[in-house]
């Protein structure tokens, strides 16, 4: 026997009334599901960077990722670890990663060769000239006739700046000193053994040697930049991104820039956070750890503006770039 039509209408009315009475509950249940579905439909953009496993950029990227500063700024950071700098540059040039860290001179050389990279500052640390504690070397003039170990090769930024500063005092180091190029660890041993009188090396190798004791800074390259009439806080190391990619992913690059500034601010102001990074620093003792920490923080650069970009251009000119072939200001990433 079929139910009467009026009974069906009554059942429908009762259902509607019940729905209205619990509408608040229904909405509260449905809205989170809708938001969740929306979030699942729009995954965060991914930024992939190539860094050396024990390289100094890995320190800050580890902190950025560990504390969720990528997700907080609307992207997902993926770090690809490589064994050495050539491997990192190969990953960048082949397009297997979005970005990598290199120095200003390399970015300029790539530009002159027709490959454009966007340059986001990483550090203003270059290196230092170290001598043994008992060494009489204290000035550029004292390097005449001495054996100088140079990390980074003849085209490295540090060696270029050291020669420019010496030339300003009438000293031709390439002719008036004995120069030995080698890998930083080998040169560190050479200084300890007295096989070189002075060592020009990268800042983190310098910090490690000083932390171990027995050596001192004869002069820092940042100080030499000052003698050349330039701001010593210039970011000579940076994150590089292919320009075509940077234009297409401008919003993602801005998000990374914000997260990076937050990272640097936290690492500069909260020393206890460095205990999480210490395994990557390979700091065998507290003195080495302190020296590495202090040097990293000292190298955190100020944001780029027109004046600082112009100073970077002057630095490139000093190191041999031609005026008509300078990286344009548009390739230097300013902070949002």
Residue ranges with predicted function:
Residues 1-18:
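N-terminal secretory signal peptides that target proteins for export/translocation
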Residues 37-41:
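Boundary at the C-terminal end of the N-terminal hydrophobic targeting segment
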Residues 72, 222-232, 297-306:
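Short, solvent-exposed loop/beta-turn-alpha elements that line the ligand-binding surface or hinge
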Residues 104-105, 185-277:
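Pocket-lining segment of extracytoplasmic ligand-binding domains
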Residues 22-33:
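Bacterial N-terminal signal peptides
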Residues 246-321:
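Secondary-structure end/capping motifs
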Residues 313-336:
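Conserved C-terminal helix/tail region of periplasmic/extracytoplasmic solute-binding proteins
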Residues 42-172, 180-181, 197-203, 218:
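Short, glycine-/small- and polar/acidic-enriched structural segments
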């Amino acid at each position: 026997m079929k139910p009467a039509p009026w009974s069906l209408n009554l059942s429908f009315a009762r259902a509607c009334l019940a729905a209205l009475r619990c509408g608040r509950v229904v909405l509260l249940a449905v809205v989170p599901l809708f938001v969740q579905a929306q979030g699942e439909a729009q995954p965060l953009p991914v930024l992939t960077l190539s860094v050396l496993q024990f390289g100094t950029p890995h320190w800050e990227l580890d902190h950025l990722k560990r504390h969720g500063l990528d997700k907080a700024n609307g992207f997902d950071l993926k770090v690809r670890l490589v064994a050495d700098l050539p491997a990192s540059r190969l990953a960048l040039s082949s397009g297997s990663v979005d970005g990598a860290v290199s120095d200003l001179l390399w970015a300029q050389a790539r530009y002159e060769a027709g490959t454009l990279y966007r340059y986001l500052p990483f550090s203003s640390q270059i290196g230092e000239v170290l001598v043994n504690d008992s060494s009489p070397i204290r000035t550029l003039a004292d390097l005449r006739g001495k054996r100088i170990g140079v990390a980074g090769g003849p085209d490295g930024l540090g060696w270029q700046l050291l020669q420019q500063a010496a030339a300003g005092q009438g000293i031709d180091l390439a002719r008036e000193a004995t120069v030995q190029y080698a890998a930083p660890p080998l040169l560190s041993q050479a200084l300890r053994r007295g096989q070189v009188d002075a060592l020009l090396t990268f800042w983190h190798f310098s910090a490690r040697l000083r932390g171990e004791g027995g050596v001192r800074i004869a002069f820092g390259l940042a100080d030499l930049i000052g003698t050349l009439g330039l701001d010593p806080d210039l970011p000579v190391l940076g994150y590089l991104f292919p320009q075509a990619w940077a234009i297409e992913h401008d919003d993602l690059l801005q998000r990374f820039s914000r997260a990076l500034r937050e990272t640097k601010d936290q690492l500069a102001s909260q020393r206890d956070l460095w205990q999480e990074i210490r395994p990557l620093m390979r700091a065998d003792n507290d003195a080495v750890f302190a020296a590495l920490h202090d040097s990293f923080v000292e190298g955190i650069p100020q944001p780029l503006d027109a004046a600082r970009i112009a100073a970077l251009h002057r630095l490139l000119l000093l190191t041999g770039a031609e005026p008509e072939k300078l990286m344009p200001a548009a390739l230097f990433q300013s902070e949002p």
